């Protein structure tokens, strides 16, 4: 058992499970990469797997146990719980630190970014971090927080953060006091751009969140014991 390459005559060619773990396969469209190599390998693989499945061609043809299918275009699909690891942390300080790390993931610095772009990203990330901390500790879920942020201008958002009076959150936005309204609006726009998909796309909104009644949620820890398939439609690859 291992990575299956195919058959020639009576001989089967494969890389055993305990052999080299990295294999790349390059070929034109429709030449059998999925059907002759990937699907047979997944069918006989003893370990777990994480599969990005374009249009469901792989998932529909692999019958294995412990399979989780995450399909953002399917309203009945399992959810992805982005807050799972944060919810598990015991102290508010640890949760706040994790929320700041999440803001970094959502608003990373681009390579070769201009000084102006860096400014708006870094300062916009402060707004996002303050908002995540404020609304997370109010019990909101991720999509709900994104909707709350995007629906408000920077003045209204800052007023709400100030009124809720979470000390840690306030530390991220006090530096905006007395600064240019135009620059602050630009920072808020950068924040909105980073999370707009989660606040406005109906498919994404229905696929991200904590477990709900009748709907389980997938969490990263399950990669250690489950076979996870992420289904993405061809048309979404350029988004």
Where are these regions (language model features)?
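N-terminal pre-Walker A segment at the start of P-loop NTPase domains
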Residues: 1-16
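P-loop NTPase motor domains
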Residues: 19-239
């Amino acid at each position: 058992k291992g990575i299956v390459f195919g058959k020639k005559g009576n001989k089967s060619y494969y890389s055993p499970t305990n052999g080299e773990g990295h294999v790349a396969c390059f070929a034109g469209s429709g030449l059998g990469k999925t059907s002759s190599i990937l699907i047979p390998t997944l069918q006989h693989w003893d370990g777990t797997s994480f599969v990005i499945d374009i249009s469901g061609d792989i998932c529909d043809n692999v019958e294995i146990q412990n399979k989780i299918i995450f399909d953002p275009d399917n309203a009945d699909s399992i959810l992805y719980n982005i807050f799972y690891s944060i919810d598990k942390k015991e102290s508010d300080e640890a949760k706040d630190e994790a929320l700041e790390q999440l803001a970094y993931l959502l608003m990373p610095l681009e390579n070769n970014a201009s000084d102006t772009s860096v400014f708006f990203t870094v300062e916009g990330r402060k707004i996002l971090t303050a908002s995540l901390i404020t609304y997370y500790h109010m019990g909101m879920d991720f999509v709900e927080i994104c909707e709350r942020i995007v629906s408000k201008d920077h003045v209204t958002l800052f007023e709400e953060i100030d009124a809720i009076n979470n000390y840690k959150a306030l530390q991220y936005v006090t530096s905006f006091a007395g600064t240019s309204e135009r620059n602050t609006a630009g920072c808020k726009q950068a924040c909105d751009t980073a999370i707009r998909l989660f606040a406005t796309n109906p498919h994404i909104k229905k696929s991200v969140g904590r477990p709900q009644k009748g709907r389980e949620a997938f969490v990263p820890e399950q990669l250690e014991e489950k076979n996870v398939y992420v289904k993405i439609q061809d048309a979404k690859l350029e988004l």
